[in-house]
Amino acid sequence: NHHPVVHTIILGSLVKLGIKLFSSLNAGLFIYSIIQTIILVSTLSYTIKFMKDINVSLKYRKICLLIYSLVPVFPLYAMSPVKDVIFGCLIIIYIISFYKLINLKGKLKIKDMVMEILLIILIILFRNNGFHIVLFSLFFLLFLGRQNIFKYIIIICITITFYYSYNNVILPHFKITNGSIREVLSVPFQQTARYVKEYKKEVTSDEKKAIDKLLNYDTIASRYNPALADPVKNEFNRYYTDDDLKNYFKVWFTQLKKHPLVYVEATIANTYGYIYPVETNWYVHIKGKKIINNYGFDYHFNKKLRPLRMVLGGFAITFPYIPFIGLLINIGFNTWILLFMLSYLFYRKKYKDIILFIPSFLILLV
């Protein structure tokens, strides 16, 4: 379940459908991409309708529509067969539903309660950390009025029950393993790699053995990339034991006491792009390695459409460097927008509306 099973089933089924109907892997991916595009377009359209429902000025709705239409991140994600697109749509719908719950005047209808539960289940199914994002934000509903508190408790209980039943009963029943723990250990792994790179002579033989049990000590320094955790964590030993993990963290803590600054440097180097607007972490794959073709498939680009593909790809690659408007797809800039809006709500003492930002900040954190 490292890559969510539900998304794998959907993507795999549609690829198989394309192969069965048209003898083409490309056709299957096209079917999936069209369905995903419809989902994204429908979600973005819903945001504009919702803005109208809460009396947002037509001027701002038009600006939103222009951004959706012209900023390349939206069409590129629409056609990318990855779990994050549908998950992103679900989070948008969840935040809107969260707004409605926060501003609910009367009793929560059973129909709306069921729809909220179904939405939460989908979020959990499409992203492993979706559970934490939803659960933490749901708890704040308990402080917003007694009228619906029992129903909110039911929603929270069902959310927790489903999450643990799915991961501890349903997936094991079908012999599906949970995602690797390495995903939540990116930060300490990067810190260890930087420590080894900078203070290799100080690493004892016992420390080497403890690190090697998890991360292949011999190559960890050369694999270390300050801005990217994948090269280090990709060598994680999936056959580790609890003792291996315990011994590693003993070493991690010992090295922290010796050189705490290197841990701080490693963390900043790996995360500063999330808060630094000058940094551009934007890449577009116009063409790439078709690894899937090594396994009996025939995935290829349409050669006749290459000129159009190059024009659209060129626009996408250039967009981040267009003055001012290029910042729209800059992660650091968007983080500062969130912080600015949060500060504004504090200034205006709109404390209830601050709760709406919890899912967005949790996504940044996890």
State what each model feature region is:
Residues 176-304:
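Membrane-proximal stem/loop segments at transmembrane-domain junctions that anchor or position
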Residues 61-72, 92, 96, 120-124:
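Short helix- or helix-capping micro-motifs
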Residues 79-86, 126:
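Short acidic/glycine- and proline-prone juxtamembrane loop motifs at membrane-interface regions
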Residues 1-14, 27:
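Extracytoplasmic catalytic/substrate-binding loops of multi-pass membrane glycan-assembly enzymes
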Residues 27-31, 35, 269-361:
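Membrane-interface anchor segments at the N-terminal boundary of transmembrane helices
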Residues 34-55, 93, 340:
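Transmembrane-helix motifs of polytopic, lipid-linked glycan transferases
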Residues 112-127, 138-141, 156-163:
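Membrane-interface alpha helices of multi-pass inner-membrane proteins
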Residues 44-70, 88-89, 355:
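Transmembrane-helix signature of polytopic, membrane-embedded enzymes
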